[in-house]
């Protein structure tokens, strides 16, 4: 179904801070004002799957000395605001918040500068939530807890 024309305006903000030599914080926020502007039936409605608000907050602690030097522990949360489930705006998909975590080890102390190994856990608490819907007949669950291991090597 052709959607006509959609206008989207908004703002994205991000702040990063090194609170100490060991602690880093990152925060972000997105505001989106989207609507159908040229459509006989949908003019003024918000497009489906477009949340008005999204935000995240992340913090990590890196050990710089001692036997744990090079180890980073981090955690944070993501918020996805509610959105409409269909172009007619007849129902909303609820908002959701999930937590993530990481354990990372920098291999520089072993003569491998720029190399690291990490384990990331997305949706740490294994929260069940509806991520999006396609009209009134198809909604999709958000991703379950995922554990991802990575290794980065620079030569």
Where are these regions (language model features)?
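Generic anion/oxyanion-binding catalytic loop in active/binding sites
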Residues: 1-2, 136
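Gram-negative outer-membrane beta-barrel transporters
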Residues: 2-84
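Conserved C-terminal beta-signal and adjacent last beta-strands/turns
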Residues: 48-155
């Amino acid at each position: 179904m052709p959607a006509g024309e959609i206008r989207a305006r908004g703002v994205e903000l991000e702040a990063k801070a090194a609170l100490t030599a060991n602690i880093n914080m990152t925060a972000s926020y997105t505001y989106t004002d989207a609507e159908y502007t040229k459509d006989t039936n949908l003019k003024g409605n918000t497009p489906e799957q477009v949340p008005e608000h999204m935000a995240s907050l992340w913090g990590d602690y890196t050990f710089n000395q001692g036997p744990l030097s090079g180890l980073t522990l981090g955690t944070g949360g993501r918020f996805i605001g509610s959105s409409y489930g269909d172009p007619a705006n007849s129902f909303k998909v609820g908002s959701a918040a999930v937590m993530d975590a990481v354990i990372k080890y920098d291999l520089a102390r072993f003569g491998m500068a720029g190399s690291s190994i990490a384990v990331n856990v997305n949706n740490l608490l294994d929260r069940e939530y509806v991520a999006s819907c396609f009209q009134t007949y198809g909604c999709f669950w958000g991703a379950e807890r995922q554990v991802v291991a990575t290794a980065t090597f620079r030569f």
